[in-house]
Amino acid sequence: MSLATLIIIFLALGGWSSVSAQIEQKWKPHDRNRPAPAAVDPGAPGTETTPGRPPQDAIVLFDGKDLSKWAHKDGSAAKWKNADNYFEVVPKTGDIFTRQPFGDMQLHVEFAEPVPPRGEDQDRGNSGVIIMGLYEVQVLDSYHSKTYPDGQAGAVYGQYPPLVNASRPPGQWQTYDIIFHAPRFDDGGKLLRPAHVTVLHNGVLVQDNVEIHGPTATSDPYKPHAAKLPLELQDHNHPVRFRNIWIRELADGD
């Protein structure tokens, strides 16, 4: 049988997609011996007066009581204001970082912009959720306030504007639900796969599994880094409030 004939037969059978499907199909459809997923209490959504309840398997980063799971870059205790079920940026005290590092994750953050609103453009309720201390999802008062599109609320800062502006008025609690897959590097530091992020702002999809081009604070290319790094919240000199922050670590998809 000639090589050309073999290729024709191979393509007729679906080519690589057929082979790939056979390799990946470890379990038969409806196989009752297939391991069942663990049951997890999904928690409950919040209201304007009450924070939501995290899922049972979440790592709670702020439970409404203290900031013990956060620190400044030098390791000192977080100096942001801790109030009744929320905490607030204290301008000029510096960004805060989780004491625990994270990689692939499902992240939930609730925030509220200052009231009354002050300033315009980037000087209006500015903060940021900086994943791994490198990849920022912008926090900003974008309700009836204009700025450059890749710098408004829900943007991957400096790279992707949000698909829509889903902002609520200042003072109302808002949510980010973020699915993040960290970049992968080989042992020599070569980039194997860039980071990807999906963001829902107040339940509305604003970033759809976009490929992050590198650190968002600069236009620099990727540099190799650890598989897990702390989550960072930004002090941009505005008293933005946060509550009900939790993470579910995701299994390595490689």
Predicted regions and their residues:
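Carbohydrate-interacting regions of secretory-pathway proteins
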Residues: 18-254
